[in-house]
Amino acid sequence: MQLQATPEIEELIRQDFIALLAQKLDQVAINGGGSNEPNGILQTSGIGSVVIGTNGGAITLDKMLDLKQTVAVDNADLPTAGFLTNTKVENALSKLKDGNSQYLLSPYGGEIGQQQLANRTFMVSNNVPSNLTKGSSSGVCSAAIYGNFSDLLIGMFGSLELLVDPYTQFQSGGVGIRALQGVDIAVRHAESFGAILDITT
């Protein structure tokens, strides 16, 4: 780009920055650990919890309905609430069938964000962890979240700041660019969310 800049290349790099920042924001909103980053949903004290077993276990529709109930019991189960999990759990759920051999979660149910489970939106992000541990199931457990995501507050402070560093990679002719954006995340009401943390995948 330094040798032959074009508007197309500049726009491509801009889109790369936006995608990277969005990915990080998604990751922290879901599972931020509070160390130099905000606490995400899964690290928020007081959210509902459904346990599958001592060593985790396979996901079932009953457990997903129990997860929904942890929010409903606190009167936070609004029509706009939904499920969020990763593609491993989505794959397992997509294979479950009812007594009439009909899929519980249609594998052809539309675009991401348009599928439904128990009449609620079913969303997927691989930023939902799949490397959790429960008992002897080490590093193979996934999470699933149910909640009213309008109670997940994301505040962005100031505008995106780009800092150019022409020095660090000077000898190779490279230029470093760092993007900075002030962000804070908070769960407005812990009762608006519930999670399963021991789905073996």
What are these regions (language model features)?
Residues 1-201:
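Structured, hydrophobic secondary-structure cores that serve as assembly/anchoring elements
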